[in-house]
């Protein structure tokens, strides 16, 4: 309405001016007015292109940092270069590595006594271990070969093959989950060993390399980061690290001078809700409880 009123008043002014000059420039003014009206009308009638809706980016939730409390200290054979650890019905099953020293063991927790043992050939370097449907699955490092054992006897049942290196191994109850030292985790069919899917693990958008021993706990994947005192908790759906678990101070003093004798070995007792960790050639195995990180130094072994 305001725009129409503006055009009408200016038209009247122009006609009045032309009357005083004898309508000398009437035709020119009419042309100019027509152009003006046409341009303004075009501005009014031309639909505006809708603006794209701006959706603010949702920041990735920050991973929480956890520390630990030691609830119990158990004996552990310091000759075992721990590569995989499982607890089932009160018994530990452990994969010990190194060429010429690799084995699968059945261990009584309180005493640390090895109840049964199955040795690997000297050309195999044992790695991750998991129990699924009454069978123990054990990886080897660079040999692309795994072994299946009866859990009660540790008698070998069969072998299987995979395309990557073998580092850590766990299960979500149906598939095997394998790490190969990179930031990629592989879900394998336990029958065919075909890759069902794979997930890249990241922390704040950056890849997390050297994923080693694995444990699946109540829908979350836990992984040792090789050569560190850190365990990461991973969302298996997208590979995002949701917690950093700082186990600084847990490594025994006698293992500090040896670069390779690091934290490695996670076992969760789902029947009793107990979490155990150990390391390569460590003299102890620890039951721990995860707690929010405190600025103070984490609890150290007594």
Predicted regions, residues:
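Signature of short aromatic-glycine-proline-rich micro-motifs recurring in repeat-based ectodomains
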Residues: 82, 211, 258-265
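Short coil/turn segments that connect the beta-strands within blades of beta-propeller domains
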Residues: 89-90, 133-134, 173-174, 218-219, ...
